[in-house]
UniProtKB/Swiss-Prot annotation:
Transmembrane segments: none annotated. This is Cytadherence high molecular weight protein 3. Keywords: Cell membrane, Cell projection, Cytadherence, Membrane, Virulence. The lineage of its organism: Bacteria, Bacillati, Mycoplasmatota, Mycoplasmoidales, Mycoplasmoidaceae. GO terms for cellular component: attachment organelle membrane; cell projection; plasma membrane. Its main location: membrane. It is found in: Cell projection, Attachment organelle membrane. Component of the cytoskeleton-like structure which stabilizes the shape of the wall-less mycoplasma. This cytoskeleton-like network of accessory proteins containing HMW proteins 1 to 5 allows the proper anchoring of cytadhesin proteins in the mycoplasmal membrane at the attachment organelle. Essential for successful surface parasitism. GO terms for biological process: adhesion of symbiont to microvasculature. Residues 220-236 have a biased composition (Polar residues). Residues 220-241 are annotated as: Disordered.
Amino acid sequence: MNDKQKAKINKAYNKLLKKINKRYPDVSVVYARDHKNKVHALYQDPESGNIFSLEKRKQLASNYPLFELTSDNPISFTNNIVSLNAYDDKNNLVTVQYDQDNNTFYDQNGNVLDVSSYTDEKKVPLINYLSSTQTSQEQPTQQDYPSIDAGLPKIEVDDQPKAAQHTTLETESEPDVFELNDSLNQPQQPTENLGDDQFVEKEVPPTQQLHQDLVHQQPVQVDSGSQNHSFNNSPSLKPPLVNKPAKLVQPEVKHIPQVEVQPKPQIVEPKIEPKPEVKHVSHVEIQPKPEVKPVVDSVPEVKQPEVKHVPHVEVQPKPVVDLKPQRIEPRIESKPEVIKHIPQVEVQPKAQMVEPRIEPKPETKYIPQVESTPQVEVHHWKPEVKTEYQPQQPLPTSGLQIKVVPRSAALLQSKLDTGFQPRQVERTTDSDITVSVSSHASLLEKINALNHQRIMSDIALKSDNTIKSSNFSRFYPENEYVATKYSDPLYSDTNQSLTSDRFSLDFDYTPKSRVNNYTPLRSTNFQNNAISNYRFSRTPSSYYPLTRRPWRLTNISSYRSSFHSPTRLSSFRRTSLPFSSSYDGLRRYPSRSYWSKDF
């Protein structure tokens, strides 16, 4: 196999490896090549032993020739099972099957066999065939696994007392020729001659003795183990003065083993004493604690007079508690007032919404009285009205017939006597409008106002030639107008129509720059080509045409709260708002969020 073929196989292997790892991440796959150097991803069914090609998703024949990727060695999927003759625990000759791949023994029936007591024909235990890392049948010796505590002294706290511990360790240890350890042993020597009382006062010896015991056992490591083990190998204890001279003295150590065995049992005896001494130390620590307790008892004594003063403080805030609801009540009253005025302030500058806001007020006041007045007037005054004033009507445009009735002194006197106020608008049986006036000037003013109300005349024609009761408010005399800032110019100026165009800017108007007095091109308004026709709220932000804003800032269903609207969550949106022009350019660009602004 040349390098070119190897490179081709390696490229195909890397490509197949990514594909198989993505599709079968949890399957153990064997990669091999056939005699045509085509790479295969192979999987063997553990139960049936059949071989499958994962990339082709089909089963391969058992004798299909397969080779390793980088060599000509054939790959065999047959189990490596060897038959052995062995002797069981009763010394009977048995045939055993050894699976070299799985490293297990089986009997003739295919069951896993425990070969702990089996030997082969050469009397070699069958356990030796198994690797100790894969089976638990063979117990590893300590030589196979060095202990974690190698090179450290074994301190058995509970099994034997300290006296026996030190005698065994020190007899094996070598004598301290340079007497370096004697300086460490000095704190122990005065304890032999001291009594318990004198020893208790120091309170330090337990910690000194623990350090002394650890340091005193250091020479054991030099001789008991191999000479390579020293304190340089132990992580925690590295006293340099003890270690290095001990290594230098090793040849002379053997001559004085018995000299130091005798004095050190004397040191052992006080080591038994610190155990009760430690108990005394704990008792000494307990004694000052009750001395602190009376101090703790005195603290609540100081608190008791403080508790007496607390109710006096409670008496003072009681009137304060009474004042709090009084202060809260005007706050609660003021909040709904602010909420009521906020929508009214927003609605008034909108010309479209002015009419529906003003109209409902006179409905409740005058409609029931209008219905009651014809009962008094119809019988006496109808024939006179029709004969005298019908040929004089000057309103042919809208099909709306208006009849002017002069007031008679007798009728006014009869109504004043009964305490009944006459109304200005009356409904007749012929669905006509009767306007009663007291002077010729007011008559001309009312007719002038009616002539210029094209919207109201269209509504009257669409509703069977009858003006709706909600529109009567515009026919009242000036002294009964609803006081709004639109009342005078709205009905007296004949040059202005009632559409929203009266309040809107010119459609082609674009504000000049405040810097160089230059009017930008209309193309700067491509984000919203009705930017200059923002209705009645030309906010400062609208002078920056490239900023995206909702297309109708102030006019979103202001005649009704869109939160309470039954269609607020539906996809249906009104195509035309009341009293708005169909040419205002805004309607052609519907908003994506028509009602979301209310939230």
